[in-house]
């Protein structure tokens, strides 16, 4: 098991933003977390990435307890935030060199990985331009490549397909599947059913800091009118019908 989350709770002041979450994610699995804005997806992913702390429960990533070992967690995790945070006065090539150095990669490995990933994402023409001059979608590619440089055991993506053109999104989906086939674990958030259905092995649905339903993607996609239900999930305050419609196929669903 790559990720174990046990009774996880997180507070901002007196507000509980994650409430008693339980989750198990296997190695080599692509796991999608769906839910509306404010459901707690980003907070959960930052905790998994070793960036944010939590108040109750436990989070174990690749047999490492996250709360007391954030540096060790960050060494084995690649994390891509929803909004790229990059050094915009550098070129992508300079930035990847910097990332390689802080990841303790030797120069040859950094250059080889950079070259392969730049080619895969069709970024050759942008590699020597200042990051600050690039479009949002191209910056997102830079952020993704940086997260992949050290070949992480766990890749955590927060709405990371936002801004990618269809061709790049397909390349990225194929790359995620290749990583999973090689044993890496991929966790990403989205509110778009189509992305989750095309990519994920399992899906969790979050609302108000809680997991409302969870199961195999094949079971979720098989549900009648699933797309309409997900639209209601992301736009309506009342999602009881979503949970009720899915509960039958999700209950006792094994990995």
Q: What are these model-predicted stretches?
A:
Residues 155-159:
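Catalytic Walker B motif of ABC-type/P-loop ATPase nucleotide-binding domains
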Residues 214-215:
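ABC ATPase "signature
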Residues 57-65, 72-73:
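Conserved ABC transporter NBD signature motif
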Residues 49:
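Helix-to-loop junction immediately C-terminal to a conserved catalytic motif
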Residues 97, 101, 108-126:
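Conserved ABC ATPase "signature" region
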């Amino acid at each position: 098991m790559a990720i174990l989350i046990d009774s996880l709770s997180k507070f901002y002041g007196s507000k509980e933003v994650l409430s008693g979450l339980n989750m198990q994610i296997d190695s080599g699995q692509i796991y999608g977390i769906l839910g509306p804005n404010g459901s707690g997806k980003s907070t959960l992913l930052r905790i998994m990435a070793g960036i944010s702390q939590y108040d109750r429960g436990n989070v174990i990533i690749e047999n490492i307890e996250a709360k007391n070992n954030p540096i060790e967690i960050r060494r084995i995790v690649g994390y891509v935030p929803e909004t790229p945070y990059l050094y915009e006065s550098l070129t992508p090539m300079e930035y990847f060199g910097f990332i390689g150095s802080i990841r303790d990669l030797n120069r040859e490995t950094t250059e080889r990985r950079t070259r392969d990933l730049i080619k895969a994402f069709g970024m050759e023409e942008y590699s020597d331009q200042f990051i600050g001059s690039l479009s949002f979608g191209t910056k997102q590619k830079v952020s993704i490549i940086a997260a992949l440089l050290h070949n992480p055991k766990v890749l955590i993506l927060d709405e990371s397909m936002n801004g990618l053109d269809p061709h790049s999104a397909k390349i990225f989906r194929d790359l995620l599947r290749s990583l999973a086939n090689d044993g890496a674990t991929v966790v990403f958030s989205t509110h778009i059913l189509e992305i989750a259905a095309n990519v994920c092995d399992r899906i969790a649905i979050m609302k108000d800091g809680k997991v409302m339903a969870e199961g195999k993607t094949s079971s979720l996609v098989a549900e009648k009118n699933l797309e309409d239900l997900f639209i209601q999930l992301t736009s309506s305050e009342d999602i009881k019908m979503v949970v009720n419609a899915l509960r039958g196929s999700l209950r006792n669903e094994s990995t």
